[in-house]
Amino acid sequence: MSVIKEYRTVSEVVGPLMIVDQVAGVHFNELVEIQLHDGSKRQGQVLEVQEDKAMVQLFEGSSGINLEKAKVRFTGRPLELPVSEDMVGRIFNGMGKPIDGGPAILPEKYLDIDGQAINPVARDYPDEFIQTGISAIDHLNTLVRGQKLPVFSGSGLPHKELAAQIARQATVLNSDENFAVVFAAMGITFEEAEFFMNDLRETGAIDRSVLFINLANDPAIERIATPRIALTAAEYLAYEKDMHVLVIMTDMTNYCEALREVSAARREVPGRRGYPGYLYTNLSTLYERAGRLVGKKGSVTQIPILSMPEDDITHPIPDLTGYITEGQIILSRDLYNSGYRPPINVLPSLSRLKDKGSGEGKTRGDHAATMNQLFAAYAQGKQAKELAVVLGESALSETDKLYVRFTDRFEQEYINQGFQTNRTIEESLDLGWELLSILPRTELKRIKDDMIDQYLPQTKEEER
């Protein structure tokens, strides 16, 4: 049983950090309760212990703390989340407390928010398709169970609409299996929080979702705990309740800013652009909690969303995220300004596991071939359009003009599906074939003849 120690030896408060002197038997990551002179309580966590001094990070701000009158209790246990299957359909704040007006959760157990280290040998390979209803993802950058696939966005781009669309549309094709969405929002505005809650309520998706919302006016330090709390809930539902869980985390840039704030308060030597040198390690403790385990039916799949400062993909946050995760979905400002929704730039986007979740028995036998052909045709069409800008359309061959026509229709019909359209993978594949029918059959070099005979719309081919 944990021994609770109480001290009145607070010596310093700096930003979100508090220093407690003359402590003994205190451990890293230990949960701390602070009672103020007016009787109110706040929570914190031990960040560092040196000899008889403990550094505590405060989750609920440091304003109003009287150094002489504050009582600090070290609980002897880590920060834990009370979990239960009743969490599904509920909305919580960034620290896991209900904010939807419903009753408190009756927990089946309490789980450490930092999770458990997973033995690499115990991991199962991700290879089962998740349908998001978005053609540019399902067909061209396939998401599989257990994968971590981030979305790289920018300021002003509609990543919140994309996140809400994925949250309400995502599903596994085998309807007999339980599916849930855990949504973690960090540093979002009140309007954005209302948007997410109302969207999920109106569509009924809230019934299979768990929301954790940290607002922009909540303490920044709370943002460090929010994704860990959300992932703890996801792991519980996946590995103990056999559910397939999709975790959407937005905005990871706000999380990293909170890390930088704590690092600056600790007077640490800054790394790239002022972020702490351990940013890569810290992000990996979140992203690596995705996956499947041998012997477990459930899975945890992650879609972290981050806004790239100044649309800079070389910024430390997207740069390090790309090293850890298995691909990226990139939103394009040019497509957005042209009115395309969602503005997914498919050429630089990538899902490193897309070939594992596609094919006969998972999606359809023509998935991989049409994906490769669409990529090649779109790239060639973009090159032809650039050539026309420099030399004029008269410099284009008849085949080049067909590629330009294909590219225009690909963006207008395939990418520009809107945020309310939910396409099945079969609809995405059929639309891909319809667009490929614009091109001469001799240009479809990445697809076998028997597959072309089976799927290419005959009427279009005969018209040519």
Swiss-Prot record:
Key words of the record: ATP synthesis, Hydrogen ion transport, Ion transport, Transport
Protein's GO biological process: proton motive force-driven plasma membrane ATP synthesis
Entries under InterPro entries matching the protein: ATP-synt_VA_C (IPR055190), ATPase_a/bsu_AS (IPR020003), ATPase_F1/V1/A1_a/bsu_N (IPR004100), ATPase_F1/V1/A1_a/bsu_nucl-bd (IPR000194), P-loop_NTPase (IPR027417), V-ATPase_su_B/beta (IPR022879)
PROSITE patterns: ATPASE_ALPHA_BETA (PS00152)
Entry GO MF terms: ATP binding; proton-transporting ATP synthase activity, rotational mechanism
Pfam families: ATP-synt_ab, ATP-synt_ab_N, ATP-synt_VA_C
Matches recorded under Gene3D superfamilies: 3.40.50.12240
Family: Belongs to the ATPase alpha/beta chains family.
Name listed for the protein in its UniProt record: V-type ATP synthase beta chain
